[in-house]
């Protein structure tokens, strides 16, 4: 709660006319187990003046290696699974995630960004990055992951949401 707590979140949301939010799991500690989900649900109910819909991580500790327990967590009120701004880089892991998500009908949310193409960069490639003298993240870093995931969805159809797009070219995919 050092960056934000349920009261500050509620106040900000309500001042903008928002009555419901999805909480992201990239907290400290991350939301990747039943006890953390229970805590978030209970705290949201008791402290927030808005509806809090929690999400949990796709992988334990958001490290991209071991899937969290989708079945158990979804029964506790999780509305979707995401590793927040950490993209699942490994196609085999993503295929297993999608396969399991399809079986139990849970939402997978993915931030599309190829790590190798975005490493050590902090801004989209373009006029502003050039003017500031910064190495930009090329749009292809986003497109590669989107194309990969859309291909995987053909084999493992699940509910899937692409989060935080930064390029209009990605929408065209």
Regions found by a protein language model. Name each.
Residues 67-173:
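Histidine/acidic residue-rich metal-binding segments in metalloenzymes
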Residues 1-47:
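Metal-associated gating/positioning segment near the N- to mid-region
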Residues 33-39, 62, 143-145:
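Short amphipathic alpha-helical surface micro-motifs
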Residues 20-23, 49-53, 124-134:
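Gly-rich Lys/Arg/Thr-decorated short loops/hinges at beta-loop-alpha junctions or inter-strand turns
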Residues 32, 62-65, 89-90:
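Secondary-structure boundary/capping motif
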Residues 1-4, 25-27, 53-66, 85, ...:
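Active-site mouth loops of central-metabolism enzymes
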Residues 16, 50, 76:
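Structured loop/turn residues at beta-strand edges in well-structured enzyme cores
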Residues 34-55, 99-110:
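Alpha-helix-loop-beta-strand connector modules within alpha/beta enzyme cores
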């Amino acid at each position: 709660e050092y960056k934000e707590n349920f009261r500050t979140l509620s106040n900000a949301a309500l001042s903008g006319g928002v009555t419901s939010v999805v909480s992201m799991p990239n907290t400290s500690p991350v939301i990747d187990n039943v006890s953390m989900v229970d805590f978030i649900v209970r705290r949201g109910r008791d402290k927030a003046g808005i509806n809090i819909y929690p999400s949990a991580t796709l992988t334990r500790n958001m490290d991209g290696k071991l899937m969290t327990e989708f079945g158990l967590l979804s029964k506790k009120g999780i509305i979707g699974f995401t590793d927040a701004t950490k993209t699942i880089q490994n196609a085999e892991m993503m295929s297993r995630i999608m396969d399991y998500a399809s079986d139990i009908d849970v939402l997978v949310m993915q931030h599309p960004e190829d790590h190798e193409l975005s490493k050590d960069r902090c801004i989209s490639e373009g006029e502003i990055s050039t003017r500031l003298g910064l190495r930009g993240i090329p749009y292809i870093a986003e497109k590669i992951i989107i194309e990969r995931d859309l291909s995987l969805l053909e084999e493992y159809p699940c509910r899937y949401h692409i989060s935080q797009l930064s390029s209009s070219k990605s929408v065209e995919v």
